[in-house]
Amino acid sequence: MGKRIIIALGGNALGKNLPEQMLAVKETSKAIADLVEAGHTVAVAHGNGPQVGMIQNAFAAYCRQEPSADVMPLSMCVAMSQGYIGYDLQNALKEELLNRGLQQGVATVLTQVVVDGNDPAFQHPTKPIGTFMSKEEAEKMAREKGWHIAEDASRGWRQVVASPKPLAVVELTTIRALAETDNVVIACGGGGIPVIATDNHHLKGAAAVIDKDLASELLAEHLDADMLIILTAVEKVAVNFNKPNQKWLDALTPEEARTYIGEGQFAPGSMLPKVEAAVKFAESKPGRTALITLLEKARDGIDGKTGTRITC
């Protein structure tokens, strides 16, 4: 019997520009279609770290040329990234499904996610966005643009922005209705458009990027998923990452994960939210499993052949 699976796809896996994204979504679609073909019900959330940074930079450059132009709010940059990533991914996935004789629909839902305007994360930016830079380049941007910068898992330096905790998925009813009628749903792109609920049901955009792994976990809980698959740049989670005593982990209990988190084993804004999301999902209901692995290893991971599985 097929499982209900939520896939959390990293924004870095979608390429650094539009041509790269077109190629990336084709490969991504093959892996997703494998799961659909195997009889699973699938919903896909995706990151937007590189893409939302590029959108923000493009509008900032335009504002320098046109001083009367408005600065584009970060929440709108997230909305734009949902649109163009969803457009490419939806079309590539539908094409792949049809080529396999599969008739499932594919729908992208522009998704807002409620956050708390008083979340401490607004005072402590940790979420990497934009492209990787050298330390010298990052320090220059910090001086010239006032960016907060941080090293991202030893891969380079990036701008970091606020990443508040996701509280509620505004379009949940619509997403659930689509998922329950044989559609592959693309939702919570970039972690969702961050909004703050105000009086009279008004939703106000927030200057933040929600972590897509935590948003995916929230979506997975409310869609009553059996499995949350968090895709990343490595096949398994490791402790002592990039050190001589590095150790790959086949399985983790929530208790073991918390011990490693307490030791500072996982980088904030990178592997840490993935492990935190996996633990939260595994503990949310008996029988639920989270898997952290590479995109191309997702099907093997479901079968228990690879990846890091987090279960109670």
Feature locations, PLM:
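C-terminal catalytic "cap/lid" subdomain
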Residues: 2-312
